[in-house]
Amino acid sequence: MGEICQEPQKMLLCIDDSPAILKYERRMFEQSGYIVVTEASARRGLQLATMYSFDAVLLDYRMPEMNGHDLAYEIRRLRPDTPVVMVSGSEIPEETRQLVDAVVPKEEANRELVSTVARLCDRL
């Protein structure tokens, strides 16, 4: 009897200080077949990003403990092959844009975010 080979599910880490955004991202990506881990603390998110191998990390730019630039820098330093997507409602400086693989405005997240993450995960 033949076995069906399925591609393993991709695992995402979403880091945002807004519980509502995290809930939205979880629902959106789980409906698209991803395994989603969410974290509201930037520092704990960084710990998770270094402890586990995620297929992509999504993060907010403005967070209280650590801003998105510093968080992206640390993830890039510790996990250089992990795609990082900045999701933000504010303008992202060019220096930060150069640290990440993609920037998606929060107001366009529902249209653009899943396709951006899928494209980056397929690169791996």
Describe every region a protein language model picked out:
Residues D60:
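Active-site residues of response regulator receiver
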Residues T38-Q47, G68:
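Helix N-cap/capping motif at the beta->alpha junctions
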Residues M63:
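Receiver (REC) domain active-site loop signature in two-component systems and cognate sites
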Residues S53-D55, R79-P83:
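His-Asp phosphorelay/catalytic-motif detector in bacterial-type signaling
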Residues M1-M11, A109-L124:
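Non-catalytic signal-transmission and effector/linker regions of two-component phosphorelay proteins
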Residues Q47, H69-P80:
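Short amphipathic alpha-helix used as the core "switch/output" element in two-component signaling
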Residues Q9-A20, E25-F29, V57:
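Conserved acidic segment of CheY-like receiver
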